[in-house]
A protein has these predicted regions:
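A structural motif corresponding to the C-terminal end of an alpha-helix
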Residues: 104-115, 199-223, 257-293
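Oxyanion-hole/transition-state-stabilizing segment in secreted/luminal serine hydrolases
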Residues: 131-195, 229-244, 401-402
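Short amphipathic alpha-helices and their capping/turn segments at secondary-structure boundaries
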Residues: 48-69, 133-153, 206-223, 423
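Mobile gating loops/cap/lid regions near enzyme active sites that modulate substrate access
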Residues: 231-268, 275-408
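Structural recognition of the beta-strand scaffold that forms the well-ordered cores
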Residues: 69-81, 118-123, 151-156, 161-164, ...
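Serine-esterase "nucleophile elbow" of acetyl-processing enzymes
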Residues: 51-123, 171-180, 416-419
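Fungal secretory targeting signals
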Residues: 1-26
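N-terminal, immediately post-signal peptide pro-regions of secreted/luminal proteins
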Residues: 22-49
Length: 431
């Protein structure tokens, strides 16, 4: 899309850049000598320096410190779907063990307690880049409170733009049974989106809008940390070729070729994000955006690892959720998990197979989509049988939509790994 601006015709992403940089363009040509850290002593021994303003005092007393804060934006990987709640689950499926929430906990401890920091947790399951951008009905950017301190931002986005759920549904789970479409078609559509420029341009605009929202030219220390995704499978093992994660009897097999292609899709998404980050940083003298690639940290913790019979609901070393599978938080208990879940059958009158699809698609929520597709499948073919194993785990209760939506998302140990990789990246750049 191109827009006429005076005598110039600019692509949409270039127009956004012009708006964000505006009169501050001259700052890009100047050396920025402002420090990027808070120098006060930190309580947590493993924490890196925080991206933040120079200290307003050399005193170690908390009462002399300026209040600090940060924001988390993005999709379900940032929201931490399935990783536990302190109460009723909100519509965004935010989990208490999401890596932004874990960072917020560490951040609060390092600054002297929750009242010394501000954490805006805006990440939402199902979000795309368009839903983060300003002007959308569900805009996370518009929800960001600029009156609160924001010293850095965490961002995770891309999977929903590129059709991760469509690939999972067609190639792995077949929630809509025979009507789920072919795996090849879903993979081709994802590839076409990857090869196009729409996602790149949209991510570019999201980052520039965020810089503009926080008035980056007045906060030279402000930094955006963008996280990627992790490959789902060990693609070298042979035993997984005869295994399936499908929800219906005789679901698709996890053949090596499929695992290789799905892993390649994840790597391509990461590369796209990394290139967009590099493009933005090339406009600035100082780094404004970091890309954190934690994929290798998941080695040994994917599906189809050696000597693992999938689906293995008892393996806590797998960093991704199975359908209805338990979390692997270090202090997790069965009673605690059951207390956090609300049960509902996908075949109850609350799930109308004739009316559920539109709202589910609009929400972008994987769990709502999966539930609706299963209800539609059962209505069309009452003889359908569920796959053997523990698809109906935990006393055969249906936990919706998180029961389904969390599948192939990081469990708590995965989020701890992402958090640690973020810290490692901050340390390596000596922020």
């Amino acid at each position: 899309m191109r827009i006429l601006l005076g005598s110039l015709v600019l692509p949409l992403f270039e127009l956004a850049e012009a708006i964000v940089l505006g009169n501050s363009w001259r700052l890009l040509q100047q050396s920025n000598t402002a420090q990027h850290i808070l120098k006060e002593p930190r309580r947590h021994p493993d924490l890196p320096r925080w991206p933040g303003p120079p200290s307003h005092s050399t005193s170690s007393s908390h009462e002399h410190r300026a209040r600090a804060g940060f924001v988390a934006l993005g999709d379900s990987y940032s929201a931490g779907i399935g990783t536990g709640t302190d109460g009723p689950e909100n519509d965004c499926r935010q989990g208490v063990h999401a890596y932004p929430a874990l960072i917020a906990k560490d951040f609060s401890a390092s600054q002297g307690g929750p009242n010394s920091t501000s954490f805006q947790f805006l990440s939402c399951t199902g979000a795309t880049t368009n839903e983060i951008r300003a002007g959308h009905a569900e805009s996370q950017m518009d929800a960001l409170d600029g009156s609160l301190p924001v010293d850095f931002a965490l961002l995770s986005v891309g999977g929903n733009d590129l059709g991760f759920f469509e690939v999972m549904n067609a190639c792995i789970f077949r929630f809509y049974n025979f009507y789920s479409g072919t795996c090849e078609t879903a993979l081709q559509h994802a590839q076409e989106r990857l090869e196009g420029s729409e996602f790149d341009d949209s991510l570019y605009i999201v980052i520039l809008e965020l810089l503009n929202k926080v008035k980056w030219e007045k906060k030279p220390w402000f930094l955006i940390t963008v996280t990627g995704y992790a490959r789902f499978f060990n693609e070298q093992t042979d035993g997984c070729d005869e295994m399936s994660l499908g929800v219906w009897w005789r679901g698709p097999k996890l053949e090596k070729e499929l695992r290789v292609r799905m892993n390649a899709m994840v790597q391509a998404v990461n590369k796209k994000i990394e290139m967009t980050v590099a493009k933005i940083n090339s406009r600035f003298v100082k780094t404004k955006v970091l890309f954190v690639d934690y994929d290798k940290e998941f080695d040994g913790h994917r599906f189809c690892e050696p000597d693992v019979q999938e689906p293995d609901y008892g393996r806590s070393d797998t960093y991704f959720f199975l359908v209805g599978g338990p979390d692997n938080a270090r202090n997790e208990t069965a009673a605690g998990q059951i207390a956090q879940r609300a049960s509902i059958s996908p075949f109850s009158e609350l799930v109308d197979p004739e009316l559920c699809l539109g709202p589910a698609r609009e929400s972008g929520d994987w769990g709502r989509l999966a539930l609706c597709y299963m209800a539609m499948s059962k209505a069309q073919d009452p003889t359908l049988r569920f796959a053997s194993g523990e698809i109906q785990a935990a006393n055969s209760m249906w936990y919706v939509p998180t029961y389904y939506g969390k599948t192939f998302h990081p469990r708590t140990l995965g989020h701890e790994t992402i958090k640690n990789k973020v810290y490692e990246t901050w340390r390596s750049l000596d922020l």
